[in-house]
Amino acid sequence: MALRLVTHFDVLEDVLPSLLTQAATTDEGDRAGVLETTYGSLRVLNIERNGNIIYTYKDNKGNAVFGLYDCQTRQNEHLYTFEKDMQAVSCSVNSERTVLAASFIQYTTEGVKNDLQPGSKCLTLLVEIHPVNNVKVLKAVDSCVWVQFLYPQAESHLLPQNHLLLISEEKYIERFHIQITREDGDRVVIRNSSHLPRDRLAEDFVWAQWDLSEQRLYYIELKESRSILKCIQFRADESFNLMFEMPLDITLTGLRFKLVNFGYDYRQDREKLCNQPSLCIFTNHTGSLCMCYSPKSDSREEITYSVFYLHKGYRKIFTAAPGSADSQVTNGADSQVTDGIAFLNLGYFVAVYSPGHFLHLLNIQHPDLVCHSLFLTGNNKIAAVLPPSPLQSLPGSLVLDCYSGKVYRVTLDQSYLLRFLWNAHLDCERMAALHCILSCSQDPGFPEEQIIQWISEHVSACHSFDLIQEFLIASSYWSVYAELDDMGMLLQYSSVLTWNTEIPGIKFTTEELPLPLMKVYGLKGYWAKLNSNLEYIKYTKPHLHYHNSVVRREWHNLISEERTGKRRSTMYVRNILENAMKVIASMETRTLEPRLIPFLQEEDRHQRLLMGLMVSELRDHLLRHLQGVEKKKIEQMVLDYISKLLDLIWCLLETSWRKHSMHPLVLHLNSHCSAADFEVFHLMTRILDAASSLCLPLPPGFHSLHTILGVHCLPLYSLLHYIDNGVLLLTETAVTRLMKDLDNSEKNEQLKFSIIVRLPPLIGQKVCRLWDHPMSSNIISRNHVARLLKNYRKEPRNSMIDKSSFPVEFLPLNYFIEILMGLESSNQALYGFEGHDNVDAEFVEEAALKHTTMLLGL
């Protein structure tokens, strides 16, 4: 199962034993009778902002009893006993646990609301419970009423008065102001309880949802056949604001009146519950705002639902084939209730769940491409974990099972997703599963090593996208994402820009939406982030995502200038190289264990330049758009991001290296090629291709190892083809190793010569003298002569040559050597260069004679 459920609260385990113990101490009758009565009536009524759970049950006298489970102390507390056999509909207690509000409704013995009995059907009470004292009747009406106390921002911040929301089935919402005083020490009394001030917050609404964590009220009004979504934010200073309103282009067919997160009425007519469409709103700390909607449908062939990404300005309408249902889930007495679908908030994802049919994990943080969401059908055995009964999503990734009274903490099951990743056959499945797992990178037990192993073994498995690119970009993104919420707008999330491949079992369409109209200015917290997202959608073209195009251009310019002898400002280049040193220092601290592959041990100036340029450009990019963030923090995030990227490349290679049990001796060219060598070489080639197309840096030493493995694995013509096309770079380290390790057999001579003639001049001059061979002397001589004659102008000279000063009488050679000696004596600086102090006209003459002798076979 892609979801993992951990029981956070179980009313039968956390409450029932305490109630039985209490009954035994008070001698309330036989234990079996108490157990039967309590067990049959015990249920969860409400969950408050601080996580405390309010429950109700019937005692052995049939009285309605309210209790509270403290999630911090894990203790139960009796709140109030209503000495009458009525069914509790709703209950809430203030943060000080001194005042309780509850609503009751009369039922017949069959458990159905009695609409024929005269008198008020619903009674709403306000009770002083510290100690139990006065009871105030708030409402006595024929329609249902729900109650909810507002909570301050912190438990220690006690308000001078309490505020109670009252939601009526007659489609209005009121807020009561309850002034509390203390008399005779700790005795709590409601002041002026007969005339409680109230505000009318909403009228003519058909749907409302309470966000208990953030103290927000969402509701939908019907105006002239239009559905208007609104939101009220209640603040710690007792004020409230209408934050936004937005027209919804949906027909709420069958939605007469529905509440979300105001408790759950277990005695509602099941057919009525089943015929209601599903609608709920989810937010998270990054400023996302999603509305999920599923109309009631009688179709058994397909299920349709919509997700309104209000923070993105569009909605997606999904149509899914139900898949093969699990008979254990769909059969039974509760089958009618499970016909609909449930939406569960998992933070960065929303789970869309149809019991026994499908589970969709929708990426709400980056919903643009459907390939970043995972779509599982009944064939994936998804029905094994989530219960078939109605589920109510709560903040903090909590879910209430409305029938069993259990509260679960729901997270993505990393083990399942990893197994799914190994067994997936479609690119869309691999992409989605990879992103689901990487979103858990900050969780304990994150299986990064197993993911890297899968990547290293499946580099060629995906055809719709480059797997290595996707892994590097997404993993580096998630490594720093938690530090700043705005990273989603500034850093690249995926290497894939478009996705046109169909996903089996799912169809979708995308429709643009008008953006929510914000009603408040000077926003803070979540609302500031939501507003920032909306401003980004309205005004940002193109997107602000960082890319390396500027770095690529500047890097190529620096390399070109070095080759042509031009130089930038010394301070500019020094700053770039210092940036690279900081990244390397950050990489070295990522692990204390010795590495198998000896990266970071050579200069590799080009990679250090690229590294330093990326640090500079990414830092400037973030500083431009994160002006309220400390510069030092941004600099550290940049170093973490780039060092993580380089470390992932290193880990990919080490995983493959370890898998094939390769020995460090592979770095010596006198050993023979093996299948393991070729596997690692192929992986390095794919990494190089992925990094080059994105202009990402590689660990210093990467190119040397890649070239050494290339010499091991490739025939000469293929090797030279790779070199000529820039796949293999001839670094000084790799060529030096080649000259030292290979003997002068005919095959190796051909290889060495082919390598030397392709070397840049500066490296070639250093490497040639390491090869004790006439061919090397010939190349050194040619380079020396070319330097001397570069600016040579022929001048009249004595045609007579002193033949006695030459070992061989060969006039063309003698004449040429004399010219060289004259040039050498006139300007020493022309031919002196590092490592070749002994190269002069004499050396050239000797090399020419040896080469001629060899050609003539003498």
Swiss-Prot record:
InterPro entries linked: GSAP_C_dom (IPR028010), GSAP_fam (IPR026172)
CDD domains the UniProt entry points to: GSAP
Biological process, per Gene Ontology: positive regulation of amyloid-beta formation; regulation of proteolysis
GO molecular function: amyloid-beta binding
Entry comment on modification after translation: The protein is first synthesized as a holoprotein form of 98 kDa and rapidly processed into the gamma-secretase-activating protein 16 kDa C-terminal form, which constitutes the predominant form.
Coiled coil stretches, renumbered: none
Intracellular or extracellular location(s): Golgi apparatus, trans-Golgi network
A GO CC term attached to the entry: trans-Golgi network
Alphabetical keyword list: Golgi apparatus
Pfam families xref list: GSAP-16
Record carries keyword DNA repair: no
Family, similarity comment: Belongs to the GSAP family.
Function recorded in the entry: Regulator of gamma-secretase activity, which specifically activates the production of amyloid-beta protein (amyloid-beta protein 40 and amyloid-beta protein 42), without affecting the cleavage of other gamma-secretase targets such has Notch. The gamma-secretase complex is an endoprotease complex that catalyzes the intramembrane cleavage of integral membrane proteins such as Notch receptors and APP (amyloid-beta precursor protein).
Subunit structure: Interacts with APP; specifically interacts with the CTF-alpha product of APP. Interacts with the gamma-secretase complex.
Descriptive protein name: Gamma-secretase-activating protein
Organism: Mus musculus
Taxonomic path: Eukaryota, Metazoa, Chordata, Craniata, Vertebrata
